[in-house]
């Protein structure tokens, strides 16, 4: 086995272990934020939505800067610093008793993510061969789902005692992850050339096809982020207990572990990436529409099931398509900018979703936020269809089996 092949194989295992620690650290804390501050402390959902939206916007909106800096100086220092910063954000969240302190803790957490997320994504593109990326992204998603359940279970159990224990556990996991990267991650360059920060950003901004694709995905993310805000609140409201939230993530884990990899393997040889992305988005949009009209957990979990199936179809295709469109001379910058759609869509989804949820309750129209999200999903579906039909991505990147 050549040294390059050996490095790729070792890199895969490193990426999987690193990803599991990050997912556990994140899901121990974030699914419980809305329950802690809305249900237990009585804050308005929009206050928590602002905090979650701020974290999302800071982490993803500034990702191009984190990616460009990583292109210049390498992945390791950015990843280690970012993970320590997120740990500090979680520690601060544990003592948050006013909205401004929660917002500040989410700002720190988001800034940490800005530093570590783009270089971690770029490492996947660097280490995984193009023909293997779709399946590897599917493996990461399966791991994300399992980690989400374990993290949510652990966080729900700790929440019975003290929210500070929840935040401390998340902080410790990110400190461990920082030490893991500091110890084992080689000082790899992310791009084929050591691109200056401005040059990497300029290269991305001049790629109109990529920019249009990323911005169009904002609507997709408005739906996707509700697994962290409105869906946990809805489950808690109907069940009457925050313990029921863990079953929502258990559904995701079961579907991902049983369906994600087989669907990716089967569809990669039969359907183009953009068709898989659009099909998943359509299923997600249809499942959102009736959620506000359900009256029991069985109906709600059935719709959540459909939503997750749509995500299982769409997510590997979206990740693979974003990676395929990245210029090898500025991988960090491209993967950083690819998060801008999540920044915009996530911020609007959290803040707008929280506001619509409060408004729906005030007007006695609980279906209002869900109907709006479904409509946004359909508009995004049409926008993606127009983009793919008028601005064709090179066939070698999109065709089945590519």
From Swiss-Prot:
Residues 1-12, 117-138, 186-213, 265-276, 321-339, 389-402 are cytoplasmic. Residues 34-98, 160-164, 235-243, 298-299, 361-367 are periplasmic. CDD domains: MFS_MdtH_MDR_like. It is a multi-pass membrane protein. One of its GO terms (molecular function) is transmembrane transporter activity. It comes from the Bacteria. It is found in: Cell inner membrane. PROSITE patterns: MFS (PS50850). SUPFAM superfamilies: MFS general substrate transporter. Pfam families: MFS_1. This is Multidrug resistance protein MdtH. It comes from Salmonella typhimurium (strain LT2 / SGSC1412 / ATCC 700720).
């Amino acid at each position: 086995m050549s040294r390059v092949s050996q490095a790729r194989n070792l890199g895969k295992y490193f990426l999987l272990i690193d990803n599991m620690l990050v997912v556990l650290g994140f899901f121990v804390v974030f699914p419980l934020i809305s329950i802690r501050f809305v249900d237990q402390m009585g804050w308005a959902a929009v206050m928590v939505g602002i905090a979650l939206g701020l974290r999302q916007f800071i982490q993803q909106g500034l990702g191009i800067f984190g990616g460009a800096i990583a292109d210049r100086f390498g992945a390791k220092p950015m990843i280690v610093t970012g993970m320590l910063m997120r740990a500090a954000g979680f520690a601060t969240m544990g003592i948050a008793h006013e909205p401004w302190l929660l917002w500040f803790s989410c700002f720190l957490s988001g800034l940490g993510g800005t530093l570590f997320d783009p270089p971690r994504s770029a490492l996947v593109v660097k280490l995984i061969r193009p023909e293997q990326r779709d399946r590897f992204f599917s493996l990461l998603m399966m791991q994300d789902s399992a980690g989400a359940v374990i993290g949510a279970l652990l966080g729900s159990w700790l929440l019975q005692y003290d929210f500070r224990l929840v935040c401390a556990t998340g902080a410790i996991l990110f400190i461990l992850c920082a030490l893991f990267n500091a110890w084992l991650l080689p000082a790899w360059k992310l791009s084929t050339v050591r691109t200056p920060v401005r040059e990497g950003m300029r290269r991305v901004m001049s790629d109109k096809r990529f920019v249009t694709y990323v911005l169009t995905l904002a609507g997709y993310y408005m739906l996707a982020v509700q697994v962290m805000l409105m869906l946990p609140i809805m489950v808690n409201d109907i069940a009457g207990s925050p313990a029921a939230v863990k079953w929502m993530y258990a559904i995701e884990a079961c579907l991902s572990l049983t369906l994600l990899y087989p669907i990716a393997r089967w569809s990669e040889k039969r359907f183009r990436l953009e068709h898989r992305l659009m099909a998943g988005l359509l299923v997600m949009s249809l499942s959102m529409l009736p959620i506000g009209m359900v009256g029991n957990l069985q109906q709600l979990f059935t719709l959540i099931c459909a939503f997750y199936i749509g995500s299982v179809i769409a997510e590997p295709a979206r990740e693979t398509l974003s990676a395929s469109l990245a210029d090898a001379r500025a991988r960090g910058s491209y993967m950083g900018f690819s998060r801008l759609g999540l920044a915009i869509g996530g911020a609007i989804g959290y803040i707008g979703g929280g506001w619509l949820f409060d408004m729906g309750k005030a007007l006695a129209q609980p279906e209002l936020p869900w109907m709006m999200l479904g409509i946004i999903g359909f508009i995004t579906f049409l926008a993606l269809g127009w983009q793919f039909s008028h601005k064709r991505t090179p066939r070698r990147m999109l065709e089945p089996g590519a």
